[in-house]
Amino acid sequence: MAGHSQFKNIMHRKGRQDAQKSKLFSKLAREITVAAKLGTPDPAMNPRLRAAVIAARAENMPKDNIERAIKKASGNDAESYDELRYEGYGPGGVAVIMEVLTDNRNRAASDIRSYFTKSGGNLGETGSVSFMFDRLGVIEYDADKASVDDMLEAAIEAGADDVVSDEGGHEIYASQDTFRDVAKALESTFGEARKVALIWKPQNTIAVDDNTGEKLLKLIDLLNEHDDVQNVYANFEVSDALIAKLGG
């Protein structure tokens, strides 16, 4: 899988950058509320809500916060959020996709466009870069949940398209149409996953020099720090030395 380790490193770096728990919990709560509002407030009957709750648990979000976010969806004063996808090119021509939940799309667009302009990139139209990514479901388990062989066998039997296992855990990929069924089958064998989500996975990655890489990582940090930006994906690789230098 081209660029897989880099893809993981950059996503994990995002997790560490988001370690300001209040901001992270706010984003998780927003996704929980939106998921509950779009479907039933019962995670067992609402796959998107279940995935959001799993993500919140993985970050040790308190149970009270999770329940409050679910209840918020049914309140008369429940906020309304638009689900948007922004796409653009960062420094070095790297493709970037952002998933956004916002109560003010004009503000979100203005802020994101400003970030791209200041970084030397440009915000494009929807569809301008997403063709370079695959829309996939990913299911993640800790490494100690199963052996490599057992996870591979179970995932293939469940209908997964690909499995990547290393010391960091198991990542199982499936199409967006089947991944929830795959997740359900794996849960019956290995218990609850640490992550179940739809992602944009780059088909190929671009190796960039450290100067460009630093600009890109700063752009991604800016985007991730924005309250409305839920997820950021990009198709580049940087050196391990740069990741280490920047504390990643």
UniProtKB/Swiss-Prot annotation:
Keywords in alphabetical order: Cytoplasm, DNA-binding, Transcription, Transcription regulation
GO cellular component: a single term: cytosol
Cross-referenced InterPro entries: Integrase-like_N, TACO1_YebC-like_2nd/3rd_dom, TACO1_YebC_N, Transcrip_reg_TACO1-like, Transcrip_reg_TACO1-like_dom3, YebC-like
GO annotation (BP), single: regulation of DNA-templated transcription
Localisation per UniProt entry: Cytoplasm
Primary residence: cytoplasm
Molecular function via GO: DNA binding
Spans annotated as Disordered: 1-21
Disulfide bonds: none
Highest taxon in the source lineage: Bacteria
HAMAP family: Transcrip_reg_TACO1
Entry's family note: Belongs to the TACO1 family.
PANTHER family per UniProt: TRANSCRIPTIONAL REGULATORY PROTEIN YEBC-RELATED, TRANSLATIONAL ACTIVATOR OF CYTOCHROME C OXIDASE 1
Protein name, entry field: Probable transcriptional regulatory protein Nwi_2729
Species of origin: Nitrobacter winogradskyi (strain ATCC 25391 / DSM 10237 / CIP 104748 / NCIMB 11846 / Nb-255)
